[in-house]
């Protein structure tokens, strides 16, 4: 179904069970095929490919040569019915690739709301990308990666399979992330190492001074006081009631399978 207010360029190809909602525009030579839904107000520019079982929300801007919903680059993938779900108000720049999930995981790759995915960003199968995230040019996520809200992954930085990049963290340019990055932490290098707290980012997002000081103490417990990980956990737990924002540290410690950058 194509809504009467949608604007489809004559050279665009649309086939299969495609739903295009109100005020969507589709540019020249774009190809949309399969069980695809494109939400109201989304702009699809020229030469975009959207395939498979893919849901795209409202008011997104999808730039030329982006590919969304292609099969995963996982050799175990055997054509199963898996999907991509993209939220609202994302900027998906030129040549971004977002691949479908696999049945070995959740079967879906998800991107939240209000993200900026810069040129040549790659989001592999089964990734969970939250909201208000920035990924710089050529940043790449291997399969099963989680990027939490407000994180920044700078240009040319790859993230290893099954890693988590915590909320409000900052990954410097050309870094290689092979273990989990706790929330609020700045990290850089090959392999990625911690370099303090993302203070400027926290200030911009309205964190109060007492919260920032508590986050600093948690960072010191983890990295500066000579603690084991278990000792750091216990030290952070003593402040959870007063500063619930620290719960993100404990949540990451519990679910980590790759280990924490140290």
UniProtKB/Swiss-Prot annotation:
Species: Aliivibrio salmonicida (strain LFI1238) (Vibrio salmonicida (strain LFI1238))
GO molecular function, one term: acyl-[acyl-carrier-protein]-UDP-N-acetylglucosamine O-acyltransferase activity
Cytoplasm listed as a keyword: yes
Highest taxon above the source species: Bacteria
Assembly mode: Homotrimer.
Protein name: Acyl-[acyl-carrier-protein]--UDP-N-acetylglucosamine O-acyltransferase
Pathway connected to this protein: Glycolipid biosynthesis; lipid IV(A) biosynthesis; lipid IV(A) from (3R)-3-hydroxytetradecanoyl-[acyl-carrier-protein] and UDP-N-acetyl-alpha-D-glucosamine: step 1/6
Stored PANTHER family: ACYL-[ACYL-CARRIER-PROTEIN]--UDP-N-ACETYLGLUCOSAMINE O-ACYLTRANSFERASE, ACYL-[ACYL-CARRIER-PROTEIN]--UDP-N-ACETYLGLUCOSAMINE O-ACYLTRANSFERASE, MITOCHONDRIAL-RELATED
Localization in the cell: Cytoplasm
Gene Ontology cellular component list: cytoplasm; membrane
Coiled coil: none
Lineage per the UniProt record: Bacteria, Pseudomonadati, Pseudomonadota, Gammaproteobacteria, Vibrionales
EC number, UniProt record: 2.3.1.129
Protein keywords: Acyltransferase, Cytoplasm, Lipid A biosynthesis, Lipid biosynthesis, Lipid metabolism, Repeat, Transferase
Family: Belongs to the transferase hexapeptide repeat family. LpxA subfamily.
Physiological role: Involved in the biosynthesis of lipid A, a phosphorylated glycolipid that anchors the lipopolysaccharide to the outer membrane of the cell.
Biological processes per GO annotation: lipid A biosynthetic process
Catalytic activity reported: a (3R)-hydroxyacyl-[ACP] + UDP-N-acetyl-alpha-D-glucosamine = a UDP-3-O-[(3R)-3-hydroxyacyl]-N-acetyl-alpha-D-glucosamine + holo-[ACP]
Keyword Glycoprotein: no
Stored InterPro entries: Acetyltransf_C, Acetyltransf_C_sf, Hexapep, Lipid_A_LpxA, Trimer_LpxA-like_sf
């Amino acid at each position: 179904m194509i809504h009467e207010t949608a604007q489809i360029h004559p050279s665009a190809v649309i086939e299969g069970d495609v739903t295009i909602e109100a005020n969507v525009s589709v540019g020249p030579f774009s190809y949309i095929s399969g069980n695809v839904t494109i939400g109201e107000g989304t702009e699809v520019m020229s030469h975009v490919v959207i395939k498979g079982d893919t849901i795209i929300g409202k008011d997104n801007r999808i730039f030329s040569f982006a590919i969304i919903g292609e099969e995963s680059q996982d050799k175990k993938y055997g054509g199963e019915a898996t999907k991509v779900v993209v939220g609202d108000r994302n900027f998906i720049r030129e040549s971004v690739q977002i691949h479908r999930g696999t049945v070995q995981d959740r079967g879906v790759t998800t991107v939240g709301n209000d993200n900026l995915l810069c040129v040549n960003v790659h989001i592999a199968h089964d990734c969970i990308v939250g909201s208000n995230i920035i990924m710089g040019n050529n940043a790449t996520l291997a399969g099963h990666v989680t990027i939490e809200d407000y994180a920044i992954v700078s240009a040319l930085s790859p993230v290893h399979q099954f890693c988590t990049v915590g909320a409000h963290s900052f990954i410097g340019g050309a870094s290689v992330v092979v273990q989990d990055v706790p929330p609020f932490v700045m990290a850089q290098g090959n392999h990625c190492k911690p370099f303090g707290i993302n203070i400027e980012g926290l200030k911009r997002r309205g964190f109060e001074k007492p919260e920032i000081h508590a986050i600093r103490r948690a960072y010191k417990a983890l990295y500066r006081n000579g603690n084991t990980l278990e000792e750091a956990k216990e030290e952070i737990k003593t402040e959870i009631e007063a500063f619930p924002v620290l719960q993100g540290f404990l949540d990451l410690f519990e679910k980590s399978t790759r280990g924490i950058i140290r």
